[in-house]
Amino acid sequence: MTRFSGRPHGSVTAIPSKSAAHRYMICAALAQGRSVIRGLPGELPDDLTATLDCIRALGAAAVFRDDTLEITGINARPDVLRLDCRDSGATYRLLYPVAPLIGGRAEFMQSPSLAARPMEPVTELLKSKGVAAEKLSVSGSFGPGEFPIRGDVSSQYISGLLLALSLLEGESRIRLTTPLQSKSYVELTRASLSAFGGESQWMGQDTILVKPRRLKAADVTVEGDYTHASLFLAAGAVYGPVTVTGLDPGSIQGDRAMLSILDRMGARVDMGGGSVTVSPGRLRGIDVDVSDTPDLAPAIALAALAAEGSTVVKNGGRLRFKECDRISAIATELKRLGADIDEAPDGFTIRGGGKLHGAACRCHNDHRIAMLLIMTAGLCGGIELNGAECVSKSAPGFFGEYRQLGGSIS
């Protein structure tokens, strides 16, 4: 059991975007020649380590020095690929449709929590194309054509198809059978492919045309991560000014929306010189649709605890299929602290401004839940957590960042 206390304030540097890094690493593995990916953390988070191990298993060569990763595109094509995705949903979903185009048969290993997350839309689609597709194995190639798939379960399905279809000899179309949620992650995949010579374009609201392009080596730099920064920015609104440096103000990351959410809630948001500073204001509850930004739910919850009135987080049903059921976990653990929170099928409502108290809480083996609870410590006089080390999934340096902002760990 680890105790956390303190009211975070000060300055911290954004960690590199995990979402962008996954995509760059896979594009580099699929490209001809030697690519360079700059701006990575000195210690890779668990999820990126999973992707690195998997692209090596696919036949790419990779050398990691300091903050730079050099990747030489896939040469050998093993008959059987064994890909250990650990607990990384991005690794699994991005590589699943790619793997059968690389080797004869791909076998996937994964954590129990990842195994519980849905994959049927992709396996059923590939089966319809003649591929032997099961949740933990896939074999058999497929050709270009039309690929209908739901857009409201996981945007990673669409991103994986974009990567795979770029390798085919002819044009393909991804047709969304339901409205796309988390579109910004699909756009991030399209931008990553473009950096390596790939080409795709929207045809109306529900179809993406993917053109056959031989990916070429590139030299790219990973930008700062708005998802990870969101909790620090929310802490600035709650406790005292927090500055996050290294964030691109023109980023296409969807979680950049945290800035406008905090502004709507009444916090002061200042941008300039590659940094963002958030300072407290008279926070008020608002309604937030997280259909495109579900990973912001923990940061919104933190700000909502200190806001007057009700904050409603809605259209986040996919939060129930993350590393844990995040809606249930947020409601359960914040109630332990005395929060006035109601759980809904697709979100939650927090009536803020009430007095909280310390407690022993569970992290549910979910890095986002652990970080949320740690950042609430200043509102409740301290908190004790079991399993807080799960933050290494996305941010192995998180404890250091927390201490840098004045937090105490014992």
What role is predicted for each listed range?
Residues 1-410:
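Short, structured segments at the rim of ligand-binding sites
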